[in-house]
Curated annotation (Swiss-Prot):
Organism annotation: Pan troglodytes (Chimpanzee)
Gene: CXCR6
Protein name: C-X-C chemokine receptor type 6
Topology in the lipid bilayer: Multi-pass membrane protein
Localisation per UniProt entry: Cell membrane
rRNA processing is among the record's keywords: no
Amino acid sequence: MAEHDYHEDYGFNSFNDSSQEEHQDFLQFSKVFLPCMYLVVFVCGLVGNSLVLVISIFYHKLQSLTDVFLVNLPLADLVFVCTLPFWAYAGIHEWVFGQVMCKSLLGIYTINFYTSMLILTCITVDRFIVVVKATKAYNQQAKRMTWGKVTSLLIWVISLLVSLPQIIYGNVFNLDKLICGYHDEAISTVVLATQMTLGFFLPLLTMIVCYSVIIKTLLHAGGFQKHRSLKIIFLVMAVFLLTQMPFNLMKLIRSTHWEYYAMTSFHYTIMVTEAIAYLRACLNPVLYAFVSLKFRKNFWKLVKDIGCLPYLGVSHQWKSSEDNSKTFSASHNVEATSMFQL
């Protein structure tokens, strides 16, 4: 895909026949592995993020600042996964969609990468404020909602500006086959440094600091809500690290050790870790919606409204879920300070 061009000549032509054969085997493997991975992420991400959008807009109706951020998160991931079929086709065959489409998809990919990561950071900061400064957050809900909408807009604008180099320098190149990418080493270095800072290290540092304080605060709270919140926090951190750290470490190694470009095993590692990183588009709906009782309640409402399951078969389960949700949401202040709504 746009992150790494596996068909570029990194010195393989100067190696022996054995190295050439290994590289050809790798290219054949990438033609199968990457398109399959892209299509799996596309299908799962399309269904999951569409559900989150529909339920958030038409059922939950943006009642909190977290909801404002959560609408932008699946929207960014939804646009991202819609580009994957194009990359899957290009991985199997070659780029046949033209230069304008190439620039557009490179821009969409990059914009949504930054947008998703910055939104995750904003959600983390919001949870920090709600948990650590609960009373102040509750008394300033109107201001926080306005701040959230302005911040969401700024995130999209910043992401667009940061993505301009890839949009401008993105092009179609004719190597062994037509590929879409950007082919300027200076631009690639700048883009990589910016991406590593905004897309990984800054969110990671923010999440570590904020969640450390959140955990310390919740450990003094006690009760069921404390344990539930800690589980969600650890899940968020674990999935973020497991999906993003391997690929970002490989990109860092790639930018500082050019000798690895001639190693087929390095290309395998880059490809696999890249695919794992894209799984975030599927996992985000699970992390930020499916663990919520409110979401499950609204999901059963959606199922009932569209009639995709027999009414008698789900009515009792939906009613039970609704009653449980009412029980847990009896105290607005408890819910607002618990991370539980995530």
